[in-house]
């Protein structure tokens, strides 16, 4: 009997959000309200039983929906776990998709990894108004804020889906778009193992630390990775041959010799560009830049990796760079964001290692699920549910050699510019902080050119991803990865007597200054005890609160 074809389910798009107690260290926030918007109806609920009421109401809807929550896979969905059953998709501890009855829940952050505030349509609010003892008197304002978030998210997601389809992640979306211009095939596991030693990430390095007063400039490359994809050639197959000399077909080199800050080696704490001698694995792009700048002095070439099939990704980059430029000129902020994400999200997908992929399932507690008890399986038990994970049976290897070449090309651009920098203080992937930068193309819009992003007269550098640049009394640029030193809630900093956009701008500057003061303290030899008010929810229901002592590195 011929197999019947499955009827495709037509899903309606919806946006959803919980409002909870404000974040406070060691206090697990509880939802007190939810909002739901599908483009036609908006529904909200207020009360301590809002979780149960949401599921009860959702089960009355007969039309299947895909329901998006921004960062839902790390927050909102965790309040609903006991209602989920069946297969779910999890990547790096984030729930990407899970089902409840006829509906699917998806984390919109997976396709739009930007804060909602990037849309410039998000309403700001003082989260202190959401404390239990005060929220009733601010109910109307809170519900307006909640509705605004739902409507904005629905708009963003709907526009994204209209352009790219109902994709699960931005990386998958970007690769799907790239394949329309540059078709590629998966590669073999053995090829991945052979090429992976040549893959490294971006360069981040503090050349000086402390509090530095000088004429300071911040330069960055316009779209570094799209530039590397378009304007450098890259291997584009899994067919290669080894030799011991460099030719026009060489893309990777294993060599022994002297390295003067040109190329990295891996350490337990990350990439190190300061190993002066030894054996190195280097892309041809960095090799050429190192030879030209005198920062690579080889004693011998151990082997070269050579490819006959190569490409640039010019058609893909030109298409979306042009679309992004048109969106900018039209004042279309949403599509400007979309195209920027597409341009910057494909190269990393080539480097993904699928060996740690897992298939996940969620069941009620107290049962045994066959097939999830072998090697590499994982079981996370909770009172109300059990999460079961096992190694994925079907997966593809993308071409890590492509990613190794693209990231190597990006580092080569940075290396050449560092050689032209006057008093380089700091660099990170596509940017250099220095006194001046000469003999490089300067243009605010040209792909691959350098742009003067900021200027200042004082900088506090405490380590990698930890600096604050000042112009006078104002912090104009700040980095504090791993510890949110800049207040996320800027509502309480907004002057009440100002027009909202102007008040928001003032609050953002105040928030930067607050973060900058903390980095000044650390860069001056002190320490800062960071207490994260935001909880870290685990899939098994556990909640962690992070404390860190931040000091110079």
Curated annotation (Swiss-Prot):
SS bond list: none
GO annotation, biological process: DNA replication; viral DNA genome replication
EC numbers for this chain: 2.7.7.7, 3.1.11.-
Reaction catalysis annotation: DNA(n) + a 2'-deoxyribonucleoside 5'-triphosphate = DNA(n+1) + diphosphate
Top-rank lineage group of the source organism: Viruses
InterPro entries, per the entry: DNA-dir_DNA_pol_B (IPR006172), DNA-dir_DNA_pol_B_mt/vir (IPR004868), DNA/RNA_pol_sf (IPR043502), DNA_pol_palm_dom_sf (IPR023211), RNaseH-like_sf (IPR012337), RNaseH_sf (IPR036397)
Keyword Iron belongs to the record: no
Pfam families: DNA_pol_B_2
Alphabetical list of PROSITE patterns matching this protein: DNA_POLYMERASE_B
Keywords: DNA replication, DNA-binding, DNA-directed DNA polymerase, Exonuclease, Hydrolase, Multifunctional enzyme, Nuclease, Nucleotidyltransferase, Transferase, Viral DNA replication
tRNA-binding listed as a keyword: no
The protein's role, per its UniProt record: Replicates the viral genomic DNA. This polymerase possesses two enzymatic activities: DNA synthesis (polymerase) and an exonucleolytic activity that degrades single-stranded DNA in the 3'- to 5'-direction for proofreading purpose.
Family: Belongs to the DNA polymerase type-B family.
Note: This DNA polymerase requires a protein as a primer.
Domain statement: The N-terminus contains the 3'-5' exonuclease activity and the C-terminus contains the polymerase activity.
Protein's recorded name: DNA-directed DNA polymerase
Primary gene name: I
